[in-house]
Regions:
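Ser/Thr/Pro-rich low-complexity tandem-repeat tracts
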Residues: 86, 109, 132-135, 202, ...
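Structural signature of tandem-repeat unit edges
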Residues: 44-52, 61-78, 89-102, 110-125, ...
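Hydrophobic residues embedded in beta-strands of well-ordered beta-sheets
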Residues: 16, 52-55, 176
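Consensus positions within tandem repeat domains that build extended binding/scaffold surfaces
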Residues: 82-84, 104-107, 127-130, 151-153, ...
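Low-complexity, acidic Ser/Thr/Pro-rich repeat tracts that form intrinsically disordered stalk/linker regions
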Residues: 24-46, 50-51, 62
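A structural signal for leucine-rich repeat
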Residues: 294, 315-319
Length: 414
C-alpha cells in the first residue's frame, strides 16, 4: 500500500510540474503563426502574405508585360523580393504600384529585354544590382522619395549610359551613384552630395585625388575599390558611416584621417592599402571589423583621441595584425591649428619657421618630421599634400611682409 501511494504521488507531482511550466504553453502559438503564412499566385505573379503586407516573390518566365497589383487578399503590396524577376529574358515592361516601398537586391537583374519600368511614387529603397545588366532599360524615373540605393543598382543599363553622357558624376537624390565614366586624375565632387554610393569610383585606375564636399555623410561599400593610384582624399567631418571595402586595394594611399562621427571600421575597409603608413582617428571606435587592415604592411603610426584602456577594449576582428605592429599614440591632441602656427601660440613667428625647417630637413634625410597630423596640416601652406621648400618660402614671405608693416594674408601669398 505504501509503495502504491508513493508511486501515485510521484506521478501526480510530475503532472503538476508539466502543467505549471510556463515555457511549454507558448510553443503551439509560435508554431501556428509560422504555419499561417500564405503563398499563392495572381496572374503571372507568385506572392507571400505576411501579417501586414504582400510580397511579390516570383514571376512566370514567359511574361512579357507585367502590372503588379497594389493589393492582394486585402493586404498592400509593399515589397518586391530579392531575385523575383531575375533573368526574365522575355520581360519588356513592368508597372509597379505606388504601394511598394522596397525593391530588393537583384530583383530585375539580367532582364535583357526590359525597356521600361514605372517606379512607385513613394519608393524608399532600391537594392544592390536591382536593375543591373538590363541593357535595354532606358525609361526610368526615380522618385524623390528614394533614400537608399544599393551598389551597382543600374549598372549596365542604357539609362545609366545616358546619364553618364550628360554628366560623368551621376547623381540620384543627392547620392553619387556612379563616377566610372570619369577620366580625370582629380575629381571634385559637387556640393550637395550626401552619399558616395557603393562602388561609385571603383577601378578608376587613373584617379589620384578626390575632393569631397562637407555635405557628404556616408561612404558606401567599395566606393573607392581598387583605385590603385589614389593618393589624396580628405574625409569630411560630417561623415558618420564608412562601409566595408570602401578603400579596398587603394595601394597609393599613405595616410588618412577618420572623422569623429565614425564609430565603426567594417570588414576590409582598408584591406590591401599596401602603402598606408599613418592613420588619424578623431572619434571613439566601438568596433574594428575582420581584416579591416589586412595586408597593410607599412602601417606604422596611429593617432587617436582614445585612451589606451578604451583602445584596448575595442572588439577587433581577425586578420588585423598590422594594428599590433603600429605605434598607437593615445590621447593625441588633434586640435585645428592656424596655418603655419605649429606651436599653437596664436601667431606665426620665427619659432614656427624653425619647426617647419626642422621637419622638412628631417624628411629630406628619410627621418620622421616629428609633427602631429595637425601640425603637418598647418605646415602645408599651399595645400599640396606635402610640406617642402615652397611652404617654407611662403611662411618667410608672410612673416617678412607683416613685420614690415604690410598687412598680408595667406590669400595674398598663395
Amino acid at each position: 500500500m505504501k509503495i502504491w501511494k508513493k508511486t501515485l504521488a510521484a506521478v501526480l507531482a510530475g503532472m503538476l510540474c508539466i502543467i505549471s511550466m510556463p515555457q511549454v504553453q507558448p510553443l503551439l502559438p509560435v508554431f501556428s503563426a509560422a504555419a499561417a503564412e500564405e503563398t499563392g499566385t495572381v496572374g503571372a505573379l507568385t506572392y507571400t502574405l505576411k501579417s501586414d503586407r504582400a510580397i511579390i516573390t516570383q514571376c512566370d518566365k514567359n511574361a512579357e508585360e507585367v502590372e503588379i497589383p497594389s493589393e492582394i487578399a486585402g493586404k498592400p503590396v509593399l515589397q518586391i523580393a530579392e531575385r523575383a524577376f531575375l533573368s526574365h529574358e522575355k520581360l519588356t515592361r513592368v508597372v509597379i504600384p505606388d504601394t511598394v516601398r522596397t525593391i530588393e537586391n537583384l530583383a530585375f537583374s539580367h532582364c535583357s529585354q526590359l525597356q521600361k519600368v514605372t517606379l512607385p511614387k513613394y519608393l524608399v529603397t532600391i537594392g544592390s544590382n536591382c536593375f543591373s545588366y538590363c541593357a535595354q532599360l532606358e525609361e526610368l524615373d526615380v522618385p524623390k522619395t528614394v533614400k537608399n540605393i544599393g551598389h551597382s543598382a543600374f549598372y549596365g543599363t542604357a539609362w545609366l549610359k545616358q546619364k553618364q553622357a550628360e554628366n560623368p558624376l551621376v547623381q540620384v537624390n543627392h547620392i553619387l551613384i556612379d563616377a566610372n565614366a570619369c577620366t580625370d586624375t582629380t575629381i571634385v565632387v559637387p556640393d550637395g552630395v550626401t552619399e558616395i554610393g557603393g562602388y561609385a569610383f571603383s577601378v578608376l585606375v587613373q584617379l589620384r585625388e578626390v575632393v569631397l564636399p562637407d555635405s557628404v555623410t556616408k561612404i558606401g561599400s567599395g566606393a573607392f575599390w581598387q583605385c590603385l593610384k589614389l593618393e589624396k582624399i580628405q574625409i569630411p567631418d560630417g561623415v558618420t558611416t564608412i562601409e566595408s571595402r570602401a578603400f579596398y586595394v587603394c595601394e597609393a594611399l599613405q595616410e588618412l584621417e577618420i572623422p569623429a562621427g565614425v564609430t565603426q571600421l567594417p570588414e576590409r575597409v582598408f584591406s590591401c592599402c599596401a602603402n598606408l603608413e599613418k592613420l588619424t582617428i578623431r572619434g571613439t571606435l566601438t568596433e574594428i571589423g575582420e581584416a579591416a587592415f589586412s595586408d597593410c604592411p607599412k602601417l606604422a603610426e596611429i593617432y587617436t583621441t582614445m585612451s589606451e584602456a578604451d583602445w584596448n577594449a575595442i572588439p577587433v576582428g581577425a586578420e588585423n595584425e598590422p594594428l599590433e605592429q603600429a605605434t598607437i599614440h593615445y590621447n593625441s591632441i588633434l586640435e585645428e591649428l592656424l596655418l603655419a602656427d605649429l606651436d599653437n601660440s596664436g601667431s606665426v613667428d620665427s619659432t614656427d619657421v624653425f619647426y617647419i625647417l626642422l621637419g622638412v630637413a628631417q624628411n629630406a634625410v628619410g627621418m620622421d618630421s616629428g609633427w602631429t597630423p595637425a601640425q603637418e596640416k598647418a605646415a602645408d601652406i599651399d595645400g599640396s599634400g606635402a610640406v617642402d621648400s615652397t611652404d617654407v618660402f611662403y611662411v618667410l614671405l608672410y612673416i617678412a611682409r607683416n613685420s614690415a608693416g604690410i598687412p598680408t594674408t595667406w590669400e595674398d601669398i598663395v
